[in-house]
A protein has these predicted regions:
Chain A
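Flexible, glycine-rich active-site loops centered on histidine and acidic residues
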Residues: 123-157
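Acidic-glycine-rich active-site phosphate/pyrophosphate-binding loop
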Residues: 24-31, 82-95, 132-138, 189-196, ...
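Anion-binding (especially nucleotide phosphate/pyrophosphate-binding) glycine-rich loop
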Residues: 62, 66-98
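Short beta-strand segments
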Residues: 7, 76, 105, 130-136, ...
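Condensing-enzyme catalytic core mediating Claisen C-C bond formation in acyl metabolism
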Residues: 1-45, 146-213, 217, 221, ...
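Claisen-condensing/thiolase-fold acyl-transfer catalytic domains that form or cleave C-C bonds
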Residues: 49, 53-56, 60, 79-80, ...
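Conserved small-residue
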Residues: 3-5, 31, 73, 114, ...
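Short glycine-rich phosphate-binding loop at a beta-alpha junction
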Residues: 68-76, 234-243
Length: 339, 75
């Protein structure tokens, strides 16, 4: 599998930490020191389909193909604008495509799960061109009265078009179920024949320390393993992209793997945690800024509710775009530098 | 016990960017201005250093309490 085209889209509305101070018992200092997040993009209305479609159209344009050339649409998402039809079907309509389309749910690791799925379809000869999208409206799932979690999230979408090739050098997917660490109950509906669950739905619930420890240790294990499968070490990678969940996780992984901060770009400070969208969003910013060169090795690692994780090593094959878009501060200082 | 104490003090000092000498067995975690993720990272550091599993809720009370927990787990 090779990445033939890439694109992304963010909602226009920016919500700063200061705006959160107005209705939550929190502070910019508290949020920044614990997460590295200073602002995030939040949808103004139910517009995930529109964002995912915009990201997809950019990826198709970049790949130089049209919707009719697609053999499959795979969307990694926790929940789209609709329970059904899938976001993938709604994108299919927008792209005037005629191929099979489905959503895939592996929380924040969804994009890498979807990449591996796409690679398998291509290797099996069942598809030539697959659109793989990570799209999340995670802010509408958050409990905006819980200051420990709602400050973390942002919305967005990133997409790639993949085709046959040898660019995916290694991949690892894991699942180790731990519901209590990170979960959100489904709405029970109003079925009169089913007793309501004892616990009322109340947005995202997270045991922060447990998730932090899982994320750091799993990401290190995954990165070491996918690098070794690719015949390299993590330290030999040109770029290491971590799911932008929390700057403290990224820093903890970087310190333990002794990685150069200049090889670990990030945008969490201005996007927040965009779940399955975070890796393709970051990759697209790097590509459009001209940072990605043909032949470069990129390790990617994501982790999330499940608990699940996914990691891979890609050999980048595309030339930089003709018109570059300077990326806004992709290398901000670590969050955990204490005065 | 002293060896564990000095390693815990070093790990704590590194996390806080302070001098290990300032940390004694009587030092209370509440007085160290650690946030929840500092505690998570400290536990990960100590689990790696001593090859033990530490219940994170036991990082409470004094540094000496944690040293005893690690010593018991290591036996």
């Amino acid at each position: 599998m090779n990445i033939l085209g890439i694109g992304s889209a963010l909602p226009e509305q920016v919500v700063s930490n200061q705006q959160l101070e107005e209705f939550l018992d929190t502070s910019d200092e508290w949020i920044t020191s614990r997460t590295g997040i200073t602002r995030r993009r939040v949808m103004k209305e139910s517009e995930l389909t529109r964002l995912a479609l915009a990201a997809s159209q950019r990826a198709l344009l970049d790949a130089g193909i049209s919707g009719q050339d697609l053999d499959m649409i795979l969307v990694a998402t926790t929940m789209g604008d609709y329970v059904f039809p899938s976001t993938a079907c709604l994108i299919q309509e927008g792209l005037h495509a005629a191929c099979p389309a489905m959503d895939l749910h592996a929380a924040c690791a969804g994009f890498i799960y979807a990449l591996d799925t796409a690679d398998s379809f291509i290797k099996a000869g069942k598809a030539q061109h697959i659109l793989v999208v990570g799209a999340e409206a995670i802010t509408r799932l958050a409990n905006w009265e819980d200051r420990a979690t709602c400050v973390l999230f942002g919305d967005g979408a990133g997409a790639v078009v993949v085709g046959p090739g040898e660019g995916l050098l290694s991949v690892r997917l894991t699942a180790r179920t731990d519901r209590d660490a990170l979960y959100m109950l489904a709405e029970p509906g109003n079925n009169p024949f089913t007793r309501k669950p004892d616990e009322a739905p109340g947005g995202v619930r997270m045991q922060g320390q447990d998730v932090f420890r899982f994320a750091v240790s799993q990401s290190i294990e995954d990165l070491n393993q996918v690098a070794a499968q690719a015949g390299r070490t993590v330290q030999e990678m040109d770029w290491v992209l971590l799911h932008q969940a929390n700057r403290r996780i990224i820093d903890a992984v970087r310190q333990r793997l002794k990685l150069d901060p200049a090889r670990m770009p990030g945008n969490i400070h201005r996007t927040g945690n965009t779940s399955a969208a975070s890796i393709p969003l970051l990759l697209d910013e790097m590509y459009r800024a001209g940072l990605l060169m043909p032949g470069q090795l990129i390790a990617m690692s994501a982790f999330g509710a499940g608990l699940v994780s996914g990691a891979c090593v890609l050999r980048w094959g595309k030339e930089p775009p003709k018109t570059l878009t300077p990326a806004e501060d992709l290398f901000s200082p670590p969050a955990n530098i204490k005065p | 016990m002293e060896n564990i104490m000095s390693k815990v003090a070093e790990a704590l000092a590194e996390r806080r960017g302070s001098d290990p000498q300032e940390i004694t067995a009587e030092t209370r975690f509440n007085d160290l201005a650690l946030d929840s993720l500092d505690v998570a990272e400290l536990v990960m550091d100590l689990e790696d250093a001593f090859n033990v599993t530490i219940d994170i809720t036991q990082v409470d009370g004094t540094v000496g309490d944690l040293v005893r927990v690690i010593q018991e787990a290591a036996q």
